[in-house]
Amino acid sequence: MSRFFTTGSDSESESSLSGEELVTKPVGGNYGKQPLLLSEDEEDTKRVVRSAKDKRFEELTNLIRTIRNAMKIRDVTKCLEEFELLGKAYGKAKSIVDKEGVPRFYIRILADLEDYLNELWEDKEGKKKMNKNNAKALSTLRQKIRKYNRDFESHITSYKQNPEQSADEDAEKNEEDSEGSSDEDEDEDGVSAATFLKKKSEAPSGESRKFLKKMDDEDEDSEDSEDDEDWDTGSTSSDSDSEEEEGKQTALASRFLKKAPTTDEDKKAAEKKREDKAKKKHDRKSKRLDEEEEDNEGGEWERVRGGVPLVKEKPKMFAKGTEITHAVVIKKLNEILQARGKKGTDRAAQIELLQLLVQIAAENNLGEGVIVKIKFNIIASLYDYNPNLATYMKPEMWGKCLDCINELMDILFANPNIFVGENILEESENLHNADQPLRVRGCILTLVERMDEEFTKIMQNTDPHSQEYVEHLKDEAQVCAIIERVQRYLEEKGTTEEVCRIYLLRILHTYYKFDYKAHQRQLTPPEGSSKSEQDQAENEGEDSAVLMERLCKYIYAKDRTDRIRTCAILCHIYHHALHSRWYQARDLMLMSHLQDNIQHADPPVQILYNRTMVQLGICAFRQGLTMDAHNALLDIQSSGRAKELLGQGLLLRSLQERNQEQEKVERRRQVPFHLHINLELLECVYLVSAMLLEIPYMAAHESDARRRMISKQFHHQLRVGERQPLLGPPESMREHVVAASKAMKMGDWKTCHSFIINEKMNGKVWDLFPEADKVRTMLVRKIQEESLRTYLFTYSSVYDSISMETLSDMFELDLPTVHSIISKMIINEELMASLDQPTQTVVMHRTEPTAQQNLALQLAEKLGSLVENNERVFDHKQGTYGGYFRDQKDGYRKNEGYMRRGGYRQQQSQTAY
């Protein structure tokens, strides 16, 4: 045992009194006078053996323990301080590490600390709750640990690949070699410093091995005595007595030579002590587990062991022998509902009680009125299961909700005498009197609207690229079926306002779906289809276009709220545009005047408006109306926030612009993935439309320095393409459009066509359209026509006349089309030329300046501006400011400056006379 403990202990005084004849334990100054008669020379020898290594690694272990304690209490400032000390201590032990290798407990703390800091850094809510010092220390320590760990990257990687094996190896060595470290250290670090220090001395030979074994036993004795010191002071005296007896038996020379006789009895005693120590450790662990179990009694947590699952008994709703009547069931229902929303209420148990109450009511034939009332409360409890608005329903709860609503609708359809409404008071409810119509307070429409919201939240919070999303999307068929059933119910018994609301729900689940069957029926004439196909079409019901027309017209006529009517109009326009009914969609948009006041609508309606405008622009593009397509898409694409404006994601902004609450609200407004519009397709349509408009315009106004830009985004893409020093083959969609634009500038329509329509662009964009071949044919036609216009604008100064047949062959257009294009250009005064009908040629008038003349005009303009600037500089040097005296040179020369020519002096001279 150490001198620091033996000096002030009672056991030492007792041993010195009992054994006065043996001078074996001098203290204080006697230590230096009698070095050969010490009773603690075993410990002195031990310190000599471990002095070069153990001190350094014990220091590292203590610092690591402090860091781990700081990590547990989230004290990052303390972690930073101790990490700096740890680095200094490791630098002191560098010579030992070079010989022995990096200790694994050191690698482990580096890896764990880095992972811990990364978790804190990613926890945004936790970072906001940190105080200023901890937040600053977190940033500093994170940078330091990342920089520091670069030197140990290979060690950390190997540790992370197999941390369990590393811990097991260290634990084995710890059990075999180090008996001097505490159990808490083993739990904290997994590897002790003593284990690492004894790696290379595992196989000493001869008597030195015996002596080392003896030293291990003595170390174990000393630790056991330290562990027991707090409980029994007598153990210390007995240990010291045994050490004195050993000191008598062993010669001093053998002490200095670090050799000691080792017998089989000593080995057995050491093994027994190891077993006792392991038993103590196991007892402490089991005691800790028992204490945890006692603490958890009466709480929610329960320790479960493998085996047969526990079957809980059903709760008893009523006492034995109670007569089940309507009043008793309603009273029990009110008791259950009183706990709803209170803190500590088990919501799952509440739902289970309500379901059990339904079974009891059905078994006792209490009537459908009671069952309907309980069903309403079950569905409401399912919606309240998650109190947080951001969280979505679990799959099992969602399934229960759908089943319960279907069961409720079955009861309502089977019992027409049951009336359900929000305006029915609880006092006026009739739940059991069959002579009168049954009246139940509740709103089936509100439940269905909440069901639709929950479905949207489920789709928003599911990974769209997973199979789980597909499984959830299959539930939409059930949702639509429930909405359709409620629609039929409300058409019979609901008010006009309720019918408008349920119609809007039906519209919102229909407007974005492309009706392929109706599209095929339009392509296939009735004469060409078989009788079975016609019968099948009749059985399928009305087309989506007819359904949308019927529902929307009812809302237009009956609705009294602007919001429902606005949403219905936008959905109707979207559906028309999706099915290529451009003129109906355009007329409905213009007649509604929504673009005038849409900025006053709420954000979800604005998102729907943006989606409708985008779909309208894509529809115009499919019809070949590039100008209309460009105008419809201009506002969305020019903002650079198409993703956010369409409700398909959030852009990265600074925290100052959007706090956490605003971000949550905006995420709840996002459109589910299956409603998304392809942003790459949208951008491609916009850029191609801009190309077909901008390139001919640029060619027509090439010499005009003040020409306006039709599309800033298109010009930006052109500038980006021109900045590249090396131009390779285009890869992205934007690069394809830029390359096609450069080819169109030269009038090379074939190269332009090859860049716009190829396998890569087909896969990314054009194959996504319902009528892809029709769109590609339209694009080829547009490229040929605009390339012809660009060619005439660019090279009109080169030709005196050109044959229309030549132009027809060059651009593979028929002669009437070429004639029509040139005639429009001449009528609009875009091309100064005339048509010679007998020869079918275009005669150029050469009224516009040539390229050389344009350059001369530009030079003259610049020289004129240069002369004006020089005159201003000269006047400034002469002392005339603002150009005043430049215009009044005669008055200046005649000494009639502005001080001499005022009306004030004239008035003075007149008054003098």
From Swiss-Prot:
Subcellular localization(s) per the UniProt record: Cytoplasm
Give the record's GO CC terms.
eukaryotic 43S preinitiation complex; eukaryotic 48S preinitiation complex; eukaryotic translation initiation factor 3 complex
**Among the record's GO biological process terms, what is one?**
translational initiation
PROSITE patterns given for it? Answer: PCI
**Modified how:** Phosphorylated. Phosphorylation is enhanced upon serum stimulation.
- Where is this chain compositionally biased, Basic and acidic residues type? 199-216, 261-278, 886-899
Q: Where is the composition biased (Low complexity)?
A: 8-21
Region described as Disordered = 1-44, 157-301, 522-542, 885-913
Belongs to which family?
Belongs to the eIF-3 subunit C family.
State the function annotated in the UniProt record. Component of the eukaryotic translation initiation factor 3 (eIF-3) complex, which is required for several steps in the initiation of protein synthesis. The eIF-3 complex associates with the 40S ribosome and facilitates the recruitment of eIF-1, eIF-1A, eIF-2:GTP:methionyl-tRNAi and eIF-5 to form the 43S pre-initiation complex (43S PIC). The eIF-3 complex stimulates mRNA recruitment to the 43S PIC and scanning of the mRNA for AUG recognition.
Q: What is this protein called?
A: Eukaryotic translation initiation factor 3 subunit C
**Which organism does this record belong to?**
Pongo abelii (Sumatran orangutan)
Q: Which gene encodes it?
A: EIF3C
